A protein has these predicted regions:
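Residues at beta-strand starts and edge strands
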Residues: 66, 135-137, 217-219, 289, ...
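Charged, cofactor-coupling segments
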Residues: 1, 5-29, 177, 186, ...
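N-terminal non-catalytic cap/leader segment that marks the start of a structured domain
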Residues: 1-108, 114, 290, 294
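Glycine-enriched loop-and-adjacent helix/strand subsegments that border the catalytic/binding cleft
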Residues: 75-246, 252, 282, 309-310
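Beta-rich strand-turn-strand
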Residues: 252-262
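Short gly/ser/thr-rich secondary-structure transition/capping motifs
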Residues: 61-62, 121-124, 274-276
């Protein structure tokens, strides 16, 4: 199932997307939550109600008539991990640094701004953000049930589904503040984009590769800037799985339905890495540029960079 959040007549609603049409799930069955967070909190019962409603009902809304927003518009938290070895090793090598051995010891993550989540469409920035503005091609897992001290062997059961994530980054701000060995902060917290929908795990079964370390999915990942492909990798190349990341995240801490965890940038998944490897020539995102991230099974997330009003 492809779950979405959308705006219609000023209201935010929960829906399911299918072939360009939208099911208004709450309208089909009043027992289904009318927003994504409550839907996820309802767990398997809500999912089964939604599946039954879609079987009995029909989509009544054209996707062209509504505004898609972040599938989880008000997440309790957003964490971003650092799970792809190629990206980490290449980015360090480009700065004349050896691969950091601690990468193989623990899956690391940071918190970003859970009040600055965007979906499809315009992405507003201020002038200082445009100083080496970068995209980051990532996949995000959405937590489907609460837990604490979760083992790797159990962690995949806590994932409701996946969506595309663009962790946009202002590199000049980021590099300045991280010299202080704390962060990232202003280089990241102005926003990330997610979407276009939250895909439940059952739709991704054909791509799944299970192991003792947790599930991986053989999904091609691509990034396009102004319709020109600049990046490509595969989701299954994650060195650390989401299951391992969740074990680390949940140690001594509760996680909640709707929490978002990003994979971190995939190999070649940003201009910082591409420019350093001389694949691109000092290319960054500019005002008016369109960036599209595409992952097999998860769709395409497209954003246009615009100047924030005021």
């Amino acid at each position: 199932m492809k779950l979405i959040s959308y705006k219609q007549n000023g209201n935010i609603k929960l829906g399911a997307f299918e072939e360009g049409k939208i099911y208004d799930l709450h309208a089909l069955d009043g027992h289904i939550a009318d927003n994504m967070l409550e839907f996820l909190q309802g767990g398997e019962e809500q999912l089964q109600l939604a599946m039954a409603a879609m079987e009995d009902g029909s989509p009544t809304i054209s996707a062209e008539d509504v505004e898609l927003i972040s599938p989880v518009p008000n997440p309790p938290s957003v964490r971003d991990a650092y799970a792809f070895r190629q990206h980490v090793a290449t980015a360090r090598r480009n700065r004349g640094l050896e691969m950091i051995p601690e990468f193989d010891e623990i899956p690391i993550f940071y918190f970003t701004n859970h009040h600055a989540v965007f979906g499809e469409g315009y992405f507003p920035v201020l002038s200082r953000h445009t100083e080496k503005l970068d995209f980051e091609l990532e996949c995000a897992a959405v937590i489907g049930k609460g837990g604490r001290n979760i083992s790797t062997s159990d962690a995949d059961d806590y994932i409701a589904g996946f969506m595309i994530m663009n962790d946009l980054s202002a590199r000049v701000l980021q590099m300045q503040e991280m010299k202080l060995n704390l962060g990232p902060a202003k280089g990241k917290d102005f926003g990330s984009t997610f979407g276009p929908w939250l895909v439940t795990k059952d739709e991704l079964e054909p791509y799944k590769k299970s192991s003792a370390d947790g599930d991986r999915y053989d999904l091609k990942m691509k990034a396009f800037v102004n319709d020109i492909q600049v990046s490509g990798d595969t989701f299954s190349n994650m060195t650390w799985t989401f299951a391992q990341i969740i074990e680390r995240v949940s140690y001594g801490v509760d996680i909640f339905p709707g929490d978002i965890i990003g994979s971190g940038t995939c190999g070649t998944g940003c201009f910082l890495e591409l420019n350093g490897s001389k694949i691109t020539d000092n290319q960054w995102l500019n005002l008016g540029d369109t960036v599209s991230l595409e992952i097999d099974g998860l769709g395409t997330l497209t954003n246009k960079i615009v100047l924030e009003n005021g």
